[in-house]
Amino acid sequence: MGAGEERVGAMRDDADRRLGRRALLAGGAAAAVGTAVLARQELSRLWWRLPGVERPRVAGAVDFRGARWVAASAANYRRADRPDDYPVDRVVIHVTQGGYASAVKVFQDPSHEVAAHYIVRRDGRVTQLVRELDVAYHAGNRSYNERSVGIEHEGFVEDASSFTDAMYAASARLTAAICARYGMPVDREHVIGHVEVPGTDHTDPGPHWDWDRYVGLARRARESREKI
Ligand SMILES: [Zn+2]
């Protein structure tokens, strides 16, 4: 999990912040049509007309087939339009240091300012909490948050038995799908632990996480995806 970075976004009203971005971009369009003043609604309509700025979102939609959707608090991520605004070139592996339910509760609590895109349970069940379009606050490093997809794993860094076969298999399929989506190689340069994020004091996923096994599984999952 990450610390409470990017406090600025949380302190400001989301609608106002988004209007600021809309106004900035729609300003050019307004000048082009010769209109001096536009009402707020008109600004936002122009914004939606601009191509490629933001994809339509469907409530409850997930980026990984079979994932269950549980929304994180909007204070725990920043809306974005990845990979158009921020290229995605990392998967960051985390361990929750607690149970699944308590981790989900933290991600739904606006006071924590942390959330990952996904959490994988001991039984291999995958839950998505933040769309990959958006910047989740999981890495404790702004640029790594912007460039990565974060996957939490239920369990404890110091407890090797946390990491079950079902968890490895499901998470590896998820990582394979993410790497395929953004054209990333499945390797230890692109699939990293939270411990490897610059400046972090977090140690997850820790010494019991079997990287050779995980990357091997993810590579095989990627290859079988390509054969389909
Ligand atoms: Zn972490």
What are these regions (language model features)?
Residues 2-19, 26, 39-71, 157-228:
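Basic/polar, cationic surfaces and motifs that engage anionic cell-wall
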Residues 2-140:
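N-terminal catalytic cores of peptidoglycan-degrading enzymes
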Residues 85, 110, 139-143, 159-170:
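Extracytoplasmic/periplasmic, Sec-exported soluble proteins
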Residues 142-153:
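Short coil-to-beta-strand
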Residues 136, 153-158:
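Metal-dependent polysaccharide deacetylase catalytic core of the NodB/CE4 family, i.e.
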